[in-house]
Amino acid sequence: MIQMQSMLDAADNSGARSVMCIKVLGGSHRRYAHIGDVIKVTVKEAIPRGKVKKGDVLKAVVVRTRKGVRRPDGSVIRFDRNACVLLNDNTEQPIGTRIFGPVTRELRGDKFMKIVSLAPEVL
């Protein structure tokens, strides 16, 4: 469960290391974001010569959460850290060309097939 002020890791090679959620998109009073939801983030820590810099405000899709996701068979997939993939604000396609770490099967909708295909492992 990601809410405003939540810190997340960037799971791509866009140049961001750490980002902070500043808004959960998808409703006027929406409080929490889960895996597959789009959020607005600001870059808190970035590497030199990256595609994004500290202070940039971007969209991101949540790919891993500590809370996890419940499957219809009753199993729960949880992760150690919260992580997201940064998106281009206009096209909502990933900024980076590589994805680090596993992603869940719940991202396999039409919008995020690119992220699933770039990921090294799909759980």
Swiss-Prot record:
InterPro entries: Ribosomal_uL14, Ribosomal_uL14_bac-type, Ribosomal_uL14_CS, Ribosomal_uL14_sf. CDD domains: Ribosomal_uL14 (cd00337). The gene is rplN. Binds to 23S rRNA. Forms part of two intersubunit bridges in the 70S ribosome. GO terms for cellular component: cytosolic large ribosomal subunit. This is Large ribosomal subunit protein uL14. It holds the Pfam family Ribosomal_L14. It comes from the Bacteria. GO terms for biological process: translation. GO terms for molecular function: large ribosomal subunit rRNA binding; structural constituent of ribosome. Part of the 50S ribosomal subunit. Forms a cluster with proteins L3 and L19. In the 70S ribosome, L14 and L19 interact and together make contacts with the 16S rRNA in bridges B5 and B8. Belongs to the universal ribosomal protein uL14 family. Keywords: Ribonucleoprotein, Ribosomal protein, RNA-binding, rRNA-binding.
